[in-house]
Regions:
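The −1 position to Zn-ligating cysteines in a subset of zinc-ribbon hairpins
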Residues: 71-74, 140
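Amphipathic, positively biased hydrophobic alpha-helical segments used for protein targeting
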Residues: 34, 73, 152-153
Length: 172
């Protein structure tokens, strides 16, 4: 079950016999994922199993864990976040199979029964990323909170932009 990871999952093989994969992928080997990260450092630990469910559907389940470095959207500094994905995928080849897919499964589209492992891992981790990556709590974004406090003070010397309109309304 462990060892070198194959380049693809063989879903046709999973229809005949359940098999599993376990291993690590370097983050830098996932270019679509690294495009949204602050750094390509780290590894993705994955454990996947492909086989038949009780309804005789070919399914892929498992887990993926990684510590990824993203850009904090509060202070714009790097932030390391643990990302976890638990895919529950079912192989579908036709629109009818897609329509009959029960809740709890996401479709895994493949005409030939081969799914590129790195693409699958990339897709699942991209979906697991937070919409707005940020540090936990305000203390970690020290530069942001100090800058925000400095700009939050009202500027007393600032003029009211509508004062000139009030003069025009009164007339000459």
């Amino acid at each position: 079950m462990s060892g070198a990871l194959p380049p693809s999952l063989d879903l046709a093989r999973a229809a005949r016999q359940t098999y599993g994969l376990q291993g690590r992928l370097p983050v830098k080997s996932l270019p679509r994922l690294t495009a949204v990260l602050a750094s390509d450092a780290g590894e993705v630990e994955l454990k996947l199993e492909a086989g038949l469910d009780p309804a005789r559907r070919v399914v892929v389940t498992g887990r993926m864990d990684a510590e990824l470095e993203l850009q904090c959207q509060r202070c714009l500094e790097p932030v390391k976040l643990k990302v976890h994905a638990e895919p529950h995928l079912a192989w579908v080849k036709t629109d009818e199979q897609l329509a009959a897919l029960p809740d709890g499964y996401e479709p895994l589209l493949s005409a030939d029964g081969q799914v590129a492992l790195k693409e699958l891992v990339t897709d699942e981790l991209l979906l697991a990323l937070p919409l707005v990556p940020k540090h936990e709590g305000d203390a970690a974004c020290g530069g942001f909170t100090k800058a925000a406090a400095a700009t939050a003070e009202p500027d007393e010397a600032r003029k009211n932009p509508f004062a000139e309109l009030a003069k025009l309304k009164r007339g000459p």
